[in-house]
Amino acid sequence: MYCRVVHVKAVSEIQLKMITSYIETTMMPRNLSAGQISGEVFEKSPTEIFTVSKFYDKETANKIMGLMKDEIREIAKGCKMSLLEGPRIIEGKSLND
């Protein structure tokens, strides 16, 4: 399992709403159909989100990043973005699962 976390800080609430809508309607469906296991978007503040994407392996993560390269560059022009990623080394599971 490989995970990628992206933090996005927009300059305004409306800009963040546009980015979030684009992720929901375009990027996430395409990425999931291309092999991404799951994707979640979390609100940190009215102008900040972070996304958590899971992949089977780094190769799949890089393939999907390649699909988004131009879009990411365009989004990054108007806001701040940071990226954390790596392979899972520990998995915890709830006793209720």
Model-derived features: positions:
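Short S/T/G/P-rich N-terminal loop/turn motif that feeds into the first structured element of a domain
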Residues: 1-50, 55-70, 77, 81-97
